[in-house]
Amino acid sequence: ISYITRKKTIDGETLKNFDENNSTIDDYRPKIGLIPFENLNNDNDGEFLVDGIVEDLITELSMIKEISVATRKTCFGFRGKDYTSQSFKDEWGFDFIVSGSIRSSNDRLRISVELSDMNDDRVIWSNKYDRINTDIFEIQDEIVTKIIRCIVGEIEITSLKRAHRKPTENMTSYEYTL
């Protein structure tokens, strides 16, 4: 939301738009990006499922106000590109990345997911889900719900640990805390 004013200055002080003034409000929230999952079978059904899972993860995570989630357009722009953890952190500002893959054999389906901490360049959570390939929407809903429950907890734990070990740079803030 931006507020538009006709006056660009008040008493000689240049005004900034609302977005610029409040750009640091959400800086405390962990920033998460999702990489479109790899379809290891290269079939249309698998592609449909992996895209659906990532879209639903973006939707569900964006409902959690304590987490900042990259847009669908940004996330799907990562498809097929080879970024390093350092570039995700430096170029995009992500604290965490969710990635994964899907593969199938006959009527069996395996979805692998991992949550990586970009600050330490390490996987902090991963899991695999095996299902019978019946109702793709039911599978998608079940998997997304399980993933959300796990990764949100891991993000909170990691963020709390990170906040606990990072000393304040502002002594006035520290004195008020005491």
Spans of model-derived segments:
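A short, charged/proline- and glycine-enriched loop
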Residues: I25-I32, S173-T177
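Short beta-strand segments enriched in small/hydrophobic residues
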Residues: P30-L40
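Catalytic-center loop of serine/cysteine hydrolases
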Residues: I1-E20, D43, I53-L178
